[in-house]
Amino acid sequence: FDLANYYSMHPVLLDEHFRSLPPIINYSNKEFYGGRIKVMRRNDNSKKVLETVVVPDGKVDFDATRNLPEIEALVKRLHEIVIEDERKNPDNPVSIGIISPFRAQVEQLKISVSKVLSEHMMEKHQIEIGTAHTFQGDERDIILISWAYANNSFPQSLIFLQKPNLFNVAITRARYQMINFISKDPRELPEGILRSYLGFVEEYENRFALS
């Protein structure tokens, strides 16, 4: 069905949006809100704010809800972000959120992150790890999303992670930067909002590379 029309019949938002840089909110504005949001922040063209990391060796485990290679790639990137921020910005640290649609992936992410970052560093950077439900009404400077979807994922997993309301929450929590992790070429995904969204991200990345 037409998501834009659905949400236009169920008004739940203020028209002005102050949280996210335009590239982060633009997809949601078009797909879910019919372009009714007025984005109040200006573009920051000096830094890539949308990104997709494809994990080529990623695969889900027996219950199709944990993807350890994807977790490893995300935690490595998280560690790099924190180290760079501590070097450049020690007195005003960025806040970081980590989202996955699947509870088992979230729990494994918590374990893996705790092995890399101290409790002090997690508190300093306000690191929260959870599903989209965890982040409803919340936001962070940087969001990393583990979609935990791979070539061996069950089709039902894709149906679950594409629930419109939760998908919309997940992709709109970041203020400055949004990094997606997935273990399947987005262009090989079935038609749906995940493929559409990651295609939007790819188009943004291509434009940014030429700017």
Regions flagged by a language model, labelled:
Residues Y6-P11, K48-L50, H125, E139-I142, ...:
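Short glycine-/polar-rich loops that comprise or flank the Walker A/P-loop
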Residues F1-R42, P101-R103, S183-R187:
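Conserved coupling/interface region of RecA-like P-loop/ASCE motor cores
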Residues F1-V12, N29, N152-S211:
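Helicase C-terminal subdomain and adjacent C-terminal extension
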Residues G130, D138-A150, V169, Q177-N180:
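A short beta-strand element within the Helicase C-terminal
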Residues F18-L21, I25, I71, V75, ...:
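Amphipathic alpha-helical transducer elements in NTP-driven molecular machines
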Residues F102-R103, I129-F135:
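Conserved helicase motor
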Residues G35-S114:
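Conserved helicase/translocase motor-coupling segment
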Residues G97, S114-T131:
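Conserved RecA-like helicase motor-core motifs
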